[in-house]
């Protein structure tokens, strides 16, 4: 593979990152390569270090440098409430809102009616066990307002019916098809505060 193809391949890989298209990816790659001894090597070294240090939290699925993340191990969190999010990006969005002080359960996936995914990918048995063991009083379903997020939410509501915890959903204000990671802090904070019980 010649150098031009190598650069094109790197641009293609960057363009697969969320929020980046070919043009943005090209700008990033060319920026990194213009001063590769400083920019590119620094990025590579940081990525290698992250790869060695970052693990999934054994309890919630968050990413951290410890096997029990800083949220699950914090004595200042409300241990009676769990918010169910699809990915760590949504967890970070909830944290940025500053309005949620409970714990999380990161699904890692969502369910698509079209793809017929196995619901086991959602780690729901672990969630149900946490609800009983940790005496959870409220479960907030904070999946995205996409079709897949709604499908996942309805499946979770059915799955958790045997547990006595209050089950609620983020309030309206989140547009249909919207993803939590793209909402401003004020909108997300209001959606958390005005969450609605699921019936």
UniProtKB/Swiss-Prot annotation:
GO molecular-function terms, A-Z: DNA binding; zinc ion binding
- Give start-end positions of each zinc finger (C4-type): 57-72
Tell me the superkingdom of the source.
Answer: Bacteria
Q: Name one Pfam family in it.
A: Toprim_4
Question: Keywords for this entry?
Answer: DNA damage, DNA recombination, DNA repair, Metal-binding, Zinc, Zinc-finger
Which residue ranges does the record assign to the Toprim domain?
A: 80-175
Gene3D superfamilies assigned to the protein according to its UniProt record, in alphabetical order: 3.40.1360.10, 6.10.250.240, RecR Domain 1
Alphabetically, which GO biological process terms does the record hold?
DNA recombination; DNA repair
Protein family per UniProt = Belongs to the RecR family.
Protein purpose: May play a role in DNA repair. It seems to be involved in an RecBC-independent recombinational process of DNA repair. It may act with RecF and RecO.
Designated name of the protein: Recombination protein RecR
**UniProt organism field:** Rickettsia prowazekii (strain Madrid E)
